[in-house]
Amino acid sequence: MAKNKFHDGPGPSQRQLRVGEVIRRTLSEVLARGDVHDPDLNRMSITVGEVRTSPDLKIATAYVLPLGGRGQEDVVQLLSRNKGELRRMIGKKLGLKFTPDLRFRLDETFDRLDDTRRMFDQDAVRRDLDE
């Protein structure tokens, strides 16, 4: 197999990033407009923080969080229940030969950010930073 001369690092390729961003934007628009035929899902405001795609673009993992943080378990279940309809809507926008299979995970970025802030507020860490 030929080596990819444009990407040799451990991170995602430009194509993965571009496709992930298009999926994120499309998913956000669909959820904001309430295009999904599920009243439970349409009642919730959902933030799509990031979408990561596999190197072969067959799987897309969307990191989601309900606005306000309430109902986190329900969000993943509702999105998974409606992933066929969401995948069809994304496929129309993407224009790829194959539409990636959607997987949903809770976005824990804000939790990690709070932990980092708390760590920097500790006296021992503050002393180390001042030195």
Curated annotation (Swiss-Prot):
Taxonomic lineage from the root: Bacteria, Pseudomonadati, Pseudomonadota, Alphaproteobacteria, Rhodobacterales
Single Gene Ontology BP annotation: maturation of SSU-rRNA
Keyword Cytoplasm: yes
Pfam families per record: RBFA (PF02033)
Keyword terms of this UniProt record: Cytoplasm, Ribosome biogenesis
Cell compartments where the protein resides: Cytoplasm
UniProt protein name: Ribosome-binding factor A
Any single GO CC term annotated in Swiss-Prot or TrEMBL for this entry: cytosol
Reported function: One of several proteins that assist in the late maturation steps of the functional core of the 30S ribosomal subunit. Associates with free 30S ribosomal subunits (but not with 30S subunits that are part of 70S ribosomes or polysomes). Required for efficient processing of 16S rRNA. May interact with the 5'-terminal helix region of 16S rRNA.
A single GO molecular function term of this UniProt record: ribosomal small subunit binding
PROSITE patterns the UniProt entry points to: RBFA
Subunit structure of this chain's protein: Monomer. Binds 30S ribosomal subunits, but not 50S ribosomal subunits or 70S ribosomes.
Keyword Cytoplasm: yes
InterPro entries: KH_dom-like_a/b (IPR015946), RbfA (IPR000238), RbfA_dom_sf (IPR023799), Ribosome-bd_factorA_CS (IPR020053)
Family: Belongs to the RbfA family.
